[in-house]
Curated annotation (Swiss-Prot):
Residues 67-116 are annotated as: Homodimerization domain D. It is linked to Neurodevelopmental, jaw, eye, and digital syndrome: An autosomal dominant syndrome characterized by variable features including mild-to-severe developmental delay, speech delay, autistic and/or stereotypical behaviors, ocular anomalies, under- or overdeveloped jaw, and digital anomalies such as brachydactyly, clinodactyly, syndactyly, and contractures. This is F-box/WD repeat-containing protein 11. Pathway: Protein modification; protein ubiquitination. Transmembrane segments: none annotated. Self-associates. Component of the SCF(FBXW11) complex formed of CUL1, SKP1, RBX1 and a FBXW11 dimer. Interacts with BST2 and USP47. Interacts with TRIM21. Interacts with PER3. Interacts with INAVA. Interacts with REST. Keywords: Biological rhythms, Cell cycle, Cytoplasm, Disease variant, Host-virus interaction, Nucleus, Repeat, Ubl conjugation pathway, WD repeat, Wnt signaling pathway. It comes from Homo sapiens.
Length: 542
């Protein structure tokens, strides 16, 4: 005698003949069908017990004849197709929840290829090429190379979308090295323009990219190995020799001299374009923008000049002794003096400059200042660095650590880098006042210092310029012996001031020269000079 509630072959037929609204809520019928389906997939299983919490069903596997099975399956599919999508999903969930692990694996294998769709190929078929291009435009160079090899359609999308051009443009927008290189090498003319019919094809940019990478790697190697092309400007001062300060751009170099003059040089020809006179003492510091040059002198005055005509626009008389350093930006100027004070000025225009506040607290000459929207930072011969609020001009904290007076510093973001007459360079966290690293190597006073995201470049009274690895210096695990990348020796006197970018260092000295250390345009013959990094090519201005 068969067990109670045995489901015969008529189960599926019964399910199909009963309206769906009646059987969907009937657990026994649904569970019976699930059990039957499971048994049909597992020949070794002869019976299966299913419980819904209130009753149990014993299912015997007994597959119908082939003809009946096909008929019943077609009928099930017919009813399934009549349901809404949500009802279909609900029903399939019921089935899957009652299946065994073996069946789940089989279903997963069946669904896997259905879920793997080539949407990049599918989008253009729907007229959505621009979306496919936009998706692939986020790839880096390595991934873009791989994407080109996927299939011809992907290669077509990359080519017609000019994605190599877009990748280069993205790098130029975000990386100063790429931007500067594009201008110096001339390939910026092919960027940021709508593609003309006769413009370079995608293959041009595809081949340009590795050339750019090779150029960048060569520049980095030149920095590390000290390979450079050296240009020299002889300033030919009338009386006292020495170039105390300088600043440059792509077109000109402006220098302040010990002989009280300001000289403007053409950066390409190295010829002197203009000489500005008016100070009665050495020009110790300067800064310029597209409108004005501001200079500080040992005559205790600050002068403002028209950058184009050289006309004196304003003279500020406030400090009692030499003006040693100054900075201006966004309508604010800060000057410091041998008189131990710091002056904060509101700079509405070249002719409208008013004193806002005088900061006192240093016990010796204030040699250098720097600032941003948050802090004013000053360094003094009293061995301290002081931090002040830019908005309120109130004192914030003192950074202590140098053993002797501080001659130079630069401040950016949270980092302060300072150089001292104790012959060391220190890196500081301005927010907590902690000294992060001490760099040793110079043999005399460190007179000037600048840094960017990669390097620190310092100049000292020993006549040497040193290039340091900034990222390694910020890593406490890095050995001290690995921090100095290169020492450059060409000046025959004290190095007073320097500025640098990704491609060059420009420095000035007590030896009355300005040197341009070019790490980009190094002659091919020097590229193989690994043992003579100081090899130079000198051009003397006339």
């Amino acid at each position: 005698m068969e067990p109670d509630s045995v489901i015969e072959d008529k189960t599926i037929e019964l399910m199909c003949s009963v309206p769906r609204s009646l059987w969907l809520g009937c657990a026994n019928l649904v569970e019976s069908m699930c059990a039957l389906s499971c048994l049909q997939s597992m020949p070794s299983v002869r019976c299966l017990q299913i419980s819904n919490g209130t009753s149990s069903v014993i299912v015997s596997r007994k597959r119908p004849s082939e003809g009946n099975y096909q008929k019943e399956k077609d009928l099930c599919i017919k009813y399934f197709d009549q349901w809404s999508e949500s009802d279909q999903v609900e029903f399939v969930e019921h089935l899957i929840s009652r299946m065994c692990h073996y069946q789940h694996g089989h279903i997963n294998s069946y669904l896997k290829p259905m879920l793997q769709r080539d949407f990049i190929t599918a989008l253009p078929e729907q007229g959505l090429d621009h979306i496919a291009e936009n998706i692939l435009s986020y790839l880096d160079a390595r991934s873009l190379c791989a994407a080109e090899l996927v299939c011809k359609e992907w290669q077509r999308v990359i080519s017609e979308g000019m994605l190599w051009k877009k990748l280069i443009e993205r790098m130029v927008r975000t990386d100063p090295l790429w931007k500067g290189l594009s201008e110096r090498r001339g390939w910026d003319q092919y960027l940021f323009k709508n593609r003309p019919t006769d413009g370079p094809p995608n293959s041009f940019y595809r081949s340009l990219y590795p050339k750019i990478i090779q150029d960048i790697e060569t520049i980095e190697s030149n920095w590390r190995c000290g390979r450079h092309n050296l240009q020299r400007i002889q300033c030919r001062s009338e009386n006292s020799k020495g170039v105390y300060c300088l600043q440059y751009d792509d077109e000109k170099i402006i220098s302040g001299l010990r002989d009280n003059s300001i000289k403007i040089w053409d950066k390409t020809s190295l010829e002197c374009l203009k000489v500005l006179t008016g100070h009665t003492g050495s020009v110790l510091c300067l800064q310029y923008d597209e409108r004005v040059i501001v200079t500080g002198s040992s005559d205790s005055t600050v002068r403002v000049w028209d950058v184009n005509t050289g006309e004196v626009l304003n003279t500020l008389i406030h400090h009692n002794e030499a003006v040693l350093h100054l900075r201006f930006s966004n309508g604010l100027m800060v000057t410091c003096s041998k008189d131990r004070s710091i002056a904060v000025w509101d700079m509405a225009s070249a002719t409208d400059i008013t004193l806002r506040r005088v900061l006192v607290g240093h016990r010796a000459a204030v040699n250098v200042v720097d600032f941003d929207d948050k802090y004013i930072v000053s360094a003094s011969g009293d061995r301290t660095i002081k931090v002040w609020s830019t908005s309120t001009c109130e004192f914030v904290r003192t950074l202590n650590g140098h053993k002797r007076g501080i001659a130079c510093l630069q401040y950016r973001d949270r980092l302060v880098v300072s150089g001292s007459s104790d012959n060391t360079i220190r890196l500081w966290d301005i927010e907590c006042g902690a000294c992060l690293r001490v760099l040793e190597g110079h043999e005399e006073l460190v007179r000037c210092i600048r840094f960017d995201n990669k390097r620190i470049v310092s100049g000292a009274y020993d006549g040497k310029i040193k290039v340091w690895d900034l990222q390694a210096a910020l890593d406490p695990r890095a050995p001290a012996s690995t921090l100095c990348l290169r020492t450059l020796v060409e000046h025959s006197g004290r190095v007073f001031r320097l500025q640098f970018d990704e491609f060059q260092i420009i420095s000035s000295s007590h030896d009355d020269t300005i040197l341009i250390w070019d790490f980009l345009n190094v002659p091919p013959s020097a590229q193989n000079e690994t043992r003579s990094p100081s090899r130079t090519y000198t051009y003397i201005s006339r």
